[in-house]
Amino acid sequence: MPRYTIKEREMIRRIAVIYAVGVAGFIIPFTHRYFMLLTPLVLLLSLALLIWYDRDRRKGGQLNRILFYLFVFTAGFLVEMWGVKTGALFGSYLYGSGLGPKIYGTPPLIGLNWVLMIYLTSAIFTPRRRNLLNGIVWPSLLMVGYDLIMEQVAPKMDMWSWQNDIVPLQNYLMWGVLAVIFHTLRYRMKVRDRNVMALPLFVVQTLFFLLILLSK
């Protein structure tokens, strides 16, 4: 477990409060539609927070990391676009308005969401010994576990919805395959993400979706 400074602990408390307000906002019928509009902003703020606390953001030699995450963003977005169009990858689904403007039915922010998930799960295991388990297996499994919860809540937040309101098994399989591909590439490129806020933010986001799910 990382050790946190007083300022870092204060930031973690603020993050928890913001997401707690978000849970209440989505649960209360009167405020639900207003909080749906804030989803893109929260995603962008989460990325900004991670960039700010990234241990290596001011160091040189970051070209590999920049290229890797540009690839994750582009590939993630294009795969989702193809998935929406064909239904062959994840199953039959459509994006709502929860993630903002769309290009050919797919919001560009979903590419940033892939970046966020790869970065978070990478940074959580980076402090541990570098091997295939910590570099690829555990981060990928963590992503699939996160998706298992998020998929149950996404329609309620108007992020996306599934045909017949059923999340197909192939969605989780595809999430796992993409997670392994991205993390394998990251591992081979020796991209290391060190961020003290990665674990707290991941836990808070997971609890956010879980609490909304349990409120149904």
Regions of interest found by a model, annotated:
Residues 1-216:
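Aromatic-rich, lipid-facing transmembrane alpha helices and their immediate juxtamembrane interface loops
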